[in-house]
Design a protein with these regions (language model features):
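Early extracytoplasmic/lumenal segment of secretory-pathway proteins
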Residues: 26-103
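Extracytoplasmic/periplasmic substrate-binding proteins
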Residues: 252-316
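Conserved C-terminal helix/tail region of periplasmic/extracytoplasmic solute-binding proteins
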Residues: 382-476
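Bacterial N-terminal signal peptides that target proteins for export
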Residues: 1-9
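Extracytoplasmic ligand-binding site segments that recognize negatively charged/polar headgroups
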Residues: 37, 42-45, 101-270, 284
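Mature extracytoplasmic/periplasmic domains
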Residues: 314-400, 444
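C-terminal motif of bacterial Sec signal peptides marking the signal peptidase cleavage site
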Residues: 19-22
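Short beta-strand and adjacent tight-turn residues that come in two discontinuous sequence segments
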Residues: 70, 92, 191, 257-258, ...
Length: 476
């Protein structure tokens, strides 16, 4: 059922994209327009206008950013793949980047010509991206002869783990995924409604128990990172069935599957543990502190997911030059810091400026070795990166990262995984509810299209007035 809903939403999204491409008035100054498609609440919005000014300073050309947001990777992909939407810059997750590369939906970013252009102006900020992040991106599957780093540039990253209430759960308990199956916590557990982020760590946990039971691992031994990486590709019928059996056990204890409200449930102590992303965990921990609730976050010892979102230039992009400048602009350290401030997530940019920004001996008692992350382009660690006082939730130590792996696109097995996820959650919508969902998304998307067009025209009119005023001043 969930697969069907995703398909319906994707179809409506593709239709909306087609409407936008075909609407009159938008293409008049398309070459001076940059269409950006990003996750909601995932940028310092002041940077959008600042980019317009910076781009004109660097190139002598004007550009207007049309900024739109999405909440589901698959909806974004459907607009591009099926609707041929002409977004210039998009920010998908790692597994969608894999799929877009496989389906030849991406254009290269750092071309030799563009690199020479920005080097000549001394504004090449791509080197500020951590070599560790680039290494992780290189692990993404790509067609033979293609390097994922040529087609994607990292933006934000983090881990998947357990947020817990320290009053009811100890750190030792939270260091294992077994906590998710603790009957003592019945109706106090929330789980992120993101099947990939749940499937992978539970599979790692289940396989760990299997190998311990068979004697392949000792009682306290963990899987190797190589095995964990292999499991990130595993969507076999056997593994799907194994994860389903574990999730059905866990479901008996779960109070809810949450898309965003889990943070509030934790701060209000209506939930005691929540399987969630590190960025959301930091927000919840800070909010809880303000109301006297102590929350903490761990990445269980059995292993988990390290995730990445990155910038890409889709196949149907029009303004590729401005797109490349925009991605470069987002890699500028001061802009990366502002985006971290605005979103609560962690930028892939890791130079001396960022290291200084995140360091605070006053706020943190234990120094972390982040020399794996804060590295110069030549591979040498940045001075002081081996002893950093900072938030371990946002910046996990090497020991934590060494038990985390990147998720991969499951291709045509995705439907099987979605069907399993629906069975676990008990999705069972009536025809009437389905029709309601279809109508809701149709209306919202069409209204969104109309609103974007109207806003675009208003901004175009404002731009023309500004130009007229400028020309008038120049004459007088």
């Amino acid at each position: 059922m969930q697969r069907y809903i995703y398909n319906v939403i994707a179809l409506v999204a593709a239709c909306a994209a087609t409407l936008m491409v075909g609407c009159g008035g938008i293409s008049d100054e398309r070459t001076h327009t940059l269409k950006v498609y990003n996750w909601g609440d995932y940028i310092d919005e002041d940077l959008i206008a600042e980019f317009e000014e910076w781009y004109e300073e660097q190139t002598g050309e004007s550009v207007m950013v049309v900024y739109q947001t999405f909440d589901i990777n698959e909806v974004m992909l459907a607009k591009i793949e099926n609707g041929h939407a002409d977004f210039d810059v998009v920010c998908p997750s790692e597994y969608i980047i894999e799929r877009m590369m496989r389906n030849e939906l991406l254009q290269p970013i750092l071309t030799p010509e563009f690199e020479a252009e920005i080097n000549a102006k001394d504004i090449n900020y791509f080197d500020c991206v951590s070599p560790y992040i680039k290494e992780q991106f290189s692990l993404l599957e790509a067609p033979e002869g293609q390097n994922p780093n040529d087609y994607s540039v990292g933006y934000m990253w983090g881990t998947t783990g357990i947020l817990y209430n320290a009053k009811y759960v100890s750190e030792e308990e939270a260091m294992s995924w077994s906590l998710m199956f603790d009957e003592r916590l019945q109706d106090k557990i929330f789980v992120k409604d993101a099947f990939r982020d749940v499937y992978s760590p539970i599979l790692v946990y289940a396989k760990t128990l299997e190998k311990r039971a068979s004697g392949e691992l000792g009682e306290d031994e963990m899987l190797s990172i190589e095995t964990i990486r292999e499991l990130m590709y595993d969507s076999s019928d056997e593994s799907i069935a194994l994860v389903e059996s574990y999730l059905k056990r866990m479901k008996e204890l779960v109070a809810g599957w949450e898309a965003d409200f889990g943070k509030e449930m934790m701060t209000q102590e209506k939930a005691w543990i929540n399987l969630m992303w590190s960025g959301d965990a930091v927000w919840a921990i800070e909010e809880a502190t303000n109301v006297g609730v102590e929350l903490a976050y761990t990445v269980p010892e059995e292993g988990s997911v390290v995730w990445f979102d990155g910038w890409v230039i889709p196949k149907y992009a029009v303004n590729t030059r401005a797109a490349r400048y925009f991605i470069n602009f987002m890699c500028k350290p001061e802009n990366a810091i502002r985006n971290m401030d605005a979103t609560g997530y962690v930028s892939v940019v890791t130079n001396e400026e960022v290291l200084d920004y995140i360091s605070s001996e006053e706020d943190y008692d234990e120094a972390l070795d982040l020399s794996y992350l804060f590295v110069h382009a030549d591979g040498t660690p940045i001075e002081g990166s081996d002893s950093v006082f900072t938030d371990p939730v946002l910046y996990p130590s090497r020991s934590v990262i060494d038990r985390c792996a990147v998720m991969h696109d499951s291709g045509d097995r995705t439907d099987k995984m979605l069907e399993m996820w629906s069975r676990v959650k008990g999705d069972n919508l009536s025809t009437g509810m389905l029709v309601g969902i279809i109508l809701f998304f149709s209306v919202m998307l069409v209204l969104g299209v109309a609103r974007k067009i109207n806003n675009y025209r208003k901004r175009q009119a404002h731009r023309k007035r500004r130009r007229h005023q400028f020309e008038h001043k120049a004459k007088h």
